[in-house]
Regions:
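Short, well-structured N-terminal submotif of metal-dependent ribonuclease cores
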Residues: 1-42, 55-69
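Acidic, PIN/NYN-like endoribonuclease modules and their adjacent C-terminal/linker elements
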Residues: 2, 113-145
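Conserved glycosyltransferase catalytic-site signature
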Residues: 9, 44, 106-110
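A generic structural signal for short hydrophobic patches within well-formed alpha-helices
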Residues: 12, 47, 131-132
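Conserved beta-strand segments of alpha/beta enzyme cores
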Residues: 39, 78-80, 137-139
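Short beta-strand segments at enzyme active-site cores
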Residues: 41-43, 126-127
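Active-site neighborhoods of divalent-metal-dependent phosphate/nucleic-acid chemistry enzymes
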Residues: 79-122
C-alpha cells in the first residue's frame, strides 16, 4: 500500500518527547503524513512498548496526555491498530526461526515485519536498521537515515 506507513516504538516516542534528538524532524514528517491522509499502522505490541516508555521517559502528565492522544487517534479511519492475535503470534514465531542469524531483532519488531508484509506496507517510521537488514525492501523514514 503506497499511501501507508508503519510507526514503530521509536517513532511514537520521538514524536512525543521534545527532548529526543530527532523530535522536530519526526514531528514535521508526522504532520505531513496527517495532511496527506497517509494510513498509519501500528500494533498492540508496539503500543505496549510505547506506553511503557512514555511513563519511563516523560513526566506523568506528559505520559498520560501522550497515551490518551495516541489512543484517541486510533479511533479514526486514518489510524489502524493491528492486534497480535494467536495466528499472527504463531506466524511471528516462524519468522523468529527463519531469522536465527539475526538474534538482535526483537520479537516485537518481528511482529511489525509480519504486519508490514501482510498489509504490503513498505515505509516504517523508525531508527531501527533491523528492518532493512532482512531484505524485504522496507524504507526507513525519515528518509535521511
Amino acid at each position: 500500500m503506497s499511501n501507508s506507513i508503519f510507526i514503530d516504538t521509536w517513532g511514537w516516542l520521538t514524536l512525543n518527547d521534545a527532548g529526543e534528538r530527532r523530535h522536530n524532524e519526526v514531528a514535521s514528517l508526522y504532520r505531513t503524513l496527517i495532511t496527506d491522509r497517509t494510513i498509519i499502522y501500528t500494533s498492540t505490541f508496539v503500543l505496549d512498548e510505547t506506553f511503557t516508555l512514555f511513563f519511563k521517559r516523560l513526566n506523568s502528565f506528559q505520559a498520560k496526555q501522550a497515551m490518551l492522544q495516541l489512543s484517541e487517534a486510533f479511533t479514526t479511519e486514518q489510524f489502524q491498530l493491528i492486534q497480535i492475535d494467536e495466528f499472527r503470534f504463531s506466524q511471528t514465531k516462524l519468522l523468529r526461526l527463519k531469522y536465527l542469524d539475526k538474534p538482535q531483532i526483537s520479537f516485537t519488531d518481528l511482529t511489525s515485519i509480519l504486519i508490514m508484509k501482510e498489509f504490503n506496507i513498505q515505509r516504517i517510521l523508525t531508527e531501527d536498521a533491523h528492518f532493512t537488514q532482512i531484505g524485504l525492501g522496507f524504507k526507513l523514514e525519515p528518509s535521511s537515515f
